[in-house]
Amino acid sequence: PLVANATEYPYTLYRGEALGMRAFMHFDLVRLFAAQYTVNPAAGGIPYATEFSLKTPEFESLAKNYEHIVADLLEAEALLADEEDYAGSGNFMLDRQIHFNLHAVRATLARVYLTMGNSEMAALYAQKVISEGNFSLKEKTGVVNDLAGVLSRKETIFGIYFPGFYTNVS
């Protein structure tokens, strides 16, 4: 199987992570390859893939792109709301900061709302991450480890695990 112990956790956990990651990736693409939302939401956006297909989806407006992004993130937030309750015995639930977890969803919502010019919602979601996330800033002396490629568990909301990232540079 693709995921060991896939039936040990509810479908909502996997779907929540997948929706959050889909929104995160589309958000990065739209920021890189489309106009600025606050300047012209009606401007051309990117194709937003909501299902697997060999055909490229139609290009949409920025407003429609952001509508999809926010909808995916809000659904992911609802699906991941109980993620702390899933202790499980498998490796899947270890190191939640390398999964697209509830805090990653909320941090991304804060970024999306800020990019859309909605400071009130951006502040609301940023505050949720700060107050519920148990994150703290690292001391100055610990920053050296970050430069050496060591993950800061205190400050990491989300990251993608890539074994050998720093040793496979050529």
Tell me what each language-model feature is.
Residues 1-20, 27-170:
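Structured, solvent-exposed acidic/aromatic patches
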